[in-house]
Swiss-Prot record:
Natural source organism: Coxiella burnetii (strain RSA 493 / Nine Mile phase I)
Assembly notes: Monomer and homodimer. Part of the essential Sec protein translocation apparatus which comprises SecA, SecYEG and auxiliary proteins SecDF-YajC and YidC.
Protein family according to the UniProt entry: Belongs to the SecA family.
Main localization, broad class: membrane
Disulfide bonds: none
Region (Disordered) residue spans: 568-588, 871-913
Protein name: Protein translocase subunit SecA
Annotated catalysed reactions: ATP + H2O + cellular proteinSide 1 = ADP + phosphate + cellular proteinSide 2
GO terms for biological process, alphabetical: intracellular protein transmembrane transport; protein import; protein targeting; protein transport by the Sec complex
Primary gene name: secA
GO cellular component: a single term: cytoplasm
Membrane topology listed for this record: Peripheral membrane protein
Residues that hold ATP according to the record: Q87, G105, E106, G107, K108, T109, D517
Entry keywords, A to Z: ATP-binding, Cell inner membrane, Cell membrane, Cytoplasm, Membrane, Metal-binding, Nucleotide-binding, Protein transport, Translocase, Translocation, Transport, Zinc
Origin: domain of life: Bacteria
Length: 913
């Protein structure tokens, strides 16, 4: 109540911002006559004038009105397009580091030129981030005349470019590119062996197009650069054969396993919300029996024996592949290869692979070639990458529903920009049916009715499978249609260009040509661009034909958007609706749902459908009721809330890794910048040797407790020196713990200096630097794997009444500290034993190391919630802490590691103990 009174008195935050922006727009408009009077040369000279004023101490905000007015006039002269006032308001929001929500067709691309130009005047570079290569190239080409007229350079950053081309693209004042490529370039820059190989400048200012898609939808899938692991296994194929024999256990929500009646019991349960599968007690027994039968386990062994624990990785990967990932929904199979379909856009993602063995399990399921498993070399989430920029902003047509998350995670405020013309699209209420068959019958009838009156339709589906199902229904009804999904995305531009023609029926997955407008009557520009050397008479004839089509479509009601199911996010539904009603055009939208749709089946209570049946609702009866609409919206809010919690949780864990990543990358950068690290090496040697001595000569201990033979042996093996420490102690009674430390360190340093004196100093410095880089890269790679293992199992700490997030922070810090100690010790020891090398041998070694690096693969990880907190909380209440009982003998340091790597325990997971 009080909030409403305050809003009425002072207006909403959005209204107050718009009011402030409108005053600045008035100042920009007032400058228009003055700027219009300038010659081309004088207009171009404004850029140098602005740069000089910046050097003289003026701020960007002081330059803003005049700079924006200059860009508007340049746009008129080069493109024939004049920025609307609402586009300028959008530009002001972007310059202020906010998200501008601008409706589809309102000209976001042109609106971004003003803040891009203004911020590029600093000379630090501006990145304009798009969701795909096509849009990056198109927007750069389209807006380039404005920037180049004003003396600024434009670069395009897309996959497949040579490093020299990328360096040129990043050196440009304004760089267009995809979110993936910007992120991968950042990771690659932190894997180079020479500063000249880096391509990015310090990250200054980014404008993210379709910001909701990049910062929300893709926030759960971190970017990963990986190389092939040393070995792979045919276990995926063998275990794949077992899975179809397993039976799903039928359970009601909240029911415990022991409460399930015998006839409903099975081998596994599914958590579709979190996309996880779990074996039941019966399932463990079934799998064990099948494993023993196939000779993968010995009779009497358990899946959880130390020797078999790695098998669970393959079992769970195969179980998820069979029960939660479907062909033509989550992936397609093309040329004997499994290609992921982006669930948010419907586009194919060639080259991307799911992690944790899931991709190999899907390949085994489909009979495709199983590619080798990968090992992560570098990784970062979009949350942490984009937070590296000094200033960040974004634009989209749909961000308001996610405003809280964008503010909380990124500190980005959403400003809803008014439309240039009033929006007159009619959003009709949902049509809900009991069954999917009844829903599709109603859809066909609706399409037929609108198609016959010449109204174009865009039918939105959630998956390739659903789009092909709708296509079959329409084909059966003899309704001509086009289908746009990941399988035929090559024809996307042509299909979208014709989707606004009278009576056109276009079926599209979520991709729906996002970033391109559906023009009523068809896209005249696209039509003309396909034809060369047209006579003026022919051009006028085609324009007249288009006008007739355009008028006919408007008379029929404009574009009608028909959704075949609700997405789990209201924002995606709004994106689909937004294809219609652009720039004041007429249009309409409506969703057709059934109680068998995934959203309602998983998230809306089952009792709703039971109640409808009890009330006598028939299959083909349509249900329209505010209560149903509220239930659907509530289900969507639940999913949005759950997905936000997952993203927040993943960010909380990734922030830990991010702090460590910054330390490693900073050390690496400093290494590359420095030619002589001999002082650093000396400090590292002193610290590493001192710590090693302390393990044999404990601090503040009696001499009887010292292990001198062990210390001599360790120094001999690791540093290649035979130091008679026992004799020193016999001859010199004044030696104590502190002086012994100093004498050993001095002897090891003296031996190194003697070796150094015989070598070429330049070669020695290069050896030190190269070796440190190699050790840093190797141990960071191993550390990423250890962190991943830790993250996957950390939720189990909840059963011991411990906070998993706190435990993860504590243990990951310990792992990181141990890693740094190992790097220092190995560096000191290896340098001590290293043979003298010439400068040419060092260069040859560097070349060999770089050539031996695995072929890199670029992909997104498939990350899910670690475990719902509610489940852990329940487990905390139900399970009392049990005393630890070792089921297997303790693994010796020189025995094979039980993880199956083939290494000794002390060289594998024993390192982490």
């Amino acid at each position: 109540m009080l909030g409403n009174i305050i809003k009425k008195a002072f207006g909403t935050r959005n209204e107050r911002l718009l009011k402030g922006y409108s005053k600045i727009v008035s100042r920009i408009n007032a400058l228009e006559p003055e700027i219009q009077a300038l010659s081309d040369a004088d207009l171009r000279a404004k850029t140098d004038e602005f740069k000089k004023r910046l050097v003289d101490g003026e701020g960007l905000d002081a330059l803003l009105p005049e700079a924006f007015a200059v860009v508007r006039e340049t746009s008129v002269r080069t493109l024939g397009l004049r920025h609307f006032d609402v586009q300028i308001i959008g530009g002001l929001a972007l310059h202020g580091g906010k998200i501008a929500e601008m409706r589809t067709g309102e000209g976001k691309t042109l609106g971004a030129t003003m803040p891009a130009y203004l911020n590029a005047l600093t000379g630090k570079g501006v990145h304009i981030v798009t969701v795909n290569d096509y849009l990056a190239k198109r927007d750069a080409e389209w807006m380039k005349p404005i920037y180049e007229f004003l003396g600024l350079t434009v670069g395009v950053n897309v996959p497949g470019m040579e490093p020299v081309e990328k360096q040129a693209a990043y050196a440009a004042d304004i760089t267009y590119g995809t979110n993936n490529e910007f992120g991968f370039d950042y990771l690659r820059d932190n894997m180079v062996f020479d500063l000249d190989q880096r391509v990015q400048r310090p990250l200054h200012y980014a404008i993210i197009d379709e910001v909701d898609s990049i910062l929300i939808d893709e926030a759960r899938t971190p970017l990963i650069i990986s190389g092939q692991a040393e070995e792979s296994s045919d276990l995926y194929v063998k275990i794949n054969k077992f899975i179809p024999q397993l039976k799903l256990q039928k359970m009601e929500e909240g029911q415990k396993e022991e409460e399930v009646p015998p006839e409903n019991r099975g081998d596994y349960t599914l958590d579709e919300k979190n996309r996880q599968a779990y074996l039941t007690e019966q399932g463990h027994r079934t799998i064990e029996a099948l494993m023993i039968k196939q000779g993968l386990m010995q009779a009497g062994e358990s899946l959880y024996d130390v020797s078999n624990i790695s098998l669970m990785h393959y079992v769970y990967a195969a179980l998820r592949a069979h029960t939660l990932f479907y062909r033509d929904v989550h992936y397609i199979v093309k040329n004997n290869e499994v290609i992921i379909v982006d669930e948010h856009t419907g586009r194919l993602m060639p080259g991307r692979r799911w992690s944790d063995g899931l991709h190999q399990a899907v390949e085994a399921k489909e009979g495709a070639t199983i590619q080798l498993e990968n090992q992560t070399l570098a990784t970062i989430t979009f949350q942490n990458y984009f937070r590296l920029y000094e200033k960040l902003s974004g634009m989209t047509a749909t961000a308001d529903t996610e405003a809280f998350e964008l503010q909380k995670i990124y500190g980005l405020e959403v400003v809803v920009i008014p439309t240039n013309r009033p929006m007159i699209r009619r959003d009709e209420s949902d049509q809900v049916y009991l069954t999917a068959d009844a829903k599709f019958d109603a859809i066909v009838n609706e399409v037929k009715k609108r198609h016959e009156k010449g109204q174009p339709l865009l039918i939105g589906t959630a998956s390739i499978e659903a789009s092909e199902l709708v296509a079959r229904f329409l084909k059966k009804a003899n309704i001509k249609h086009e289908i746009l999904n990941a399988k035929n995305h090559e024809r996307e531009a042509k299909i979208i260009a014709e989707a606004g023609r009278p009576g056109a029926v276009t079926i599209a997955t979520n991709m729906a040509g996002r970033g391109t407008d559906i023009v009523l009557g068809g896209n005249l520009e696209a039509e003309m661009s396909e034809l060369d050397n047209l006579a003026e008479e022919e051009i006028q004839k085609r324009k007249a034909d288009w006008q007739k089509r355009h008028d006919a479509v408007i008379a029929a009601g404009g574009l009608h958007v028909l959704g075949t199911e609700r997405h789990e996010s209201r924002r995606i539904d709004n994106q689909l609706r937004g294809r219609s009603g652009r720039q004041g055009d007429p249009g309409s939208s409506q969703f057709y749902l059934s109680m068998e749709d995934n959203l309602l089946r998983i998230f809306a209570a089952e009792r709703m459908s039971n109640m409808m049946r009890r009330l006598g609702v028939k299959e083909d009866d349509v249900i329209e009721h505010p209560w149903i609409t509220r239930a659907i919206e509530k289900a969507q809010r639940r999913v949005e809330g759950m997905n936000f919690d997952i993203r927040k949780q993943l960010l909380e864990y990734d922030d830990v890794a991010n702090d460590q990543r910054k330390v490693i990358y900073q050390q690496r950068f400093q290494l590359l910048q420095t030619d002589d690290i001999s002082e650093t090496i000396e400090a590292i040697r002193e610290e590493a040797v001192s710590e090693m001595i302390s393990s044999f000569v404990p601090p503040q201990s009696l001499e009887e407790e010292w292990d001198i033979p062990g210390l001599e042996k360790q120094i001999r093996e690791d540093f290649g020196l035979a130091l008679p420490i026992a004799q020193w102690l016999e001859k010199d009674e004044t030696l104590h713990e502190e002086t012994l430390h100093k004498r050993i360190i001095d002897e090891i340093t003296k031996a190194y200096k003697a070796k150094e004196a015989k070598a070429d100093p330049k070669a020695m410095r290069e050896v030190e630097k190269t070796l440190m880089l190699q050790l840093l890269d190797h141990h960071w790679k191993e550390h990423l794997a250890a962190m991943d293992h830790l993250r996957q199992g950390i939720h189990l700490r909840g059963y011991a009444q411990k906070n998993p997030a706190q435990e993860y922070k504590r243990e990951s810090f310990e792992l990181f500290t141990q890693m740094l100690k190992r790097i220092k010790y190995e560096l000191a020891a290896t340098l001590s034993k290293l043979e003298i090398a010439t400068e040419e041998q060092v260069a040859q070694q560097q070349r060999l190391y770089q050539q031996s690096a695995p072929e890199l693969q670029y992909h997104h990880a498939e990350m899910t919630a670690l475990q719902p907190e509610k489940e852990v909380a329940v487990a905390e209440q139900e399970e009392a802490t049990q005393p630890f009982v070792r089921s297997q003998p303790k693994v010796g340091r020189n025995e094979s590691c039980p993880c199956g790597s083939g290494k000794k325990y002390k060289q594998c997971h024993g390192k982490l103990s």
